[in-house]
Amino acid sequence: MGDTTVRWSDQADDVIRGDLTVAAAYVTPAGGVVVAGVAPCGLGDRDRGTLGFTTSLGLGKKLERIVRDPHVALAYHARDHGFSTSPAYVLAQGIASVDLEPSPARLQEFGPQVVRYLGELKQGPVWDRLLREYYAERVFVDVDVARVVTWPDLGASGEPDVAGAGGPAPAPPQDPPKGGTRPRVDVARLVGQLSAQPHRLLAWRGADGFPVVVPVAVAGHDTSGFRVVAPPGLLPAGGRRAGFLAHSYRPQLVGLATRMLTGWLDVADDGAAVYAPHTSKGFMAPPRKNLLLVSNGLMAKFGYWRSSRSGAAERLRALAAER
């Protein structure tokens, strides 16, 4: 049997090694997509054809969905405060596996990468207690890459280079949700929130099951939703569930501001696209590093406590063991 490892280009590897944050997309049971910002800290091995990121064990819902349907995508979409100067937009798609109990050796090996991207690890009696769950109760999401698509610019325009499996046909339209497709949140207020975030990404499930994530611009709104603009040919015609991410960040992810949406995307035959948001949630991280770490530590503690108390952590382990 021949080698099926996907090996991406030098340009894509430079982006993957350099970006401070990446948009991670996963599929929902209803056929939608959720897209969230994560810190990959340079995780990736081109020789093995793998990428990855870490997250908290307290985020059980996200992890459970990835375990149930491991089709994921990672969109390397911004050079802010990273180590790459490439103008390319890189979309990697693959099958994820979740390492729920990484070995101490793996966590220790990961430490220097965290320092490079996110700054020195805090240590000392108070910090050790505060950040125990944030530092130690981490899980790794490893992605066996099936395809890497590289566009020549961050707007994803121009002819892309594809490494791995060829791109599938456009995804067919989906049936609308029972609750209807119209907006369920205040569109005008939401567009005001999005306008403050320079990075905006739209995601949906492709015909082969992998999420597709592309950069978009927001161009006006009305009672039906807000209009999104992408390079010609990127958005599939028809209606479908879709996720949306808008965010900004400072060096080492201090002052991170993010807003995540789920909703309905409708693309007309002429390419005009309207997004009707159904859910919206966001947060703004503290603008100072120590305050950010305190916030992260407390959220990790609460998430881990909630996951343990509800039995979500054990259910997740049992589900992962079945796969």
Outline where the language-model segments fall.
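A short, Trp-centered hydrophobic/proline-enriched beta-strand micro-motif
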Residues: G18-T28, V72-Y76, P198-R205, G243-L245
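Short, basic/aromatic recognition patches
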Residues: M1-A23, A171-L201
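GNAT/GCN5-related N-acetyltransferase fold signature
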Residues: A24, V38-P40
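A short mixed-secondary-structure module that forms the rim of ligand-binding clefts
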Residues: C41-G82, A217-L253
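Charged, gly/pro-rich active-site loop segments
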Residues: G2-T4, F83-R189, V229-R323
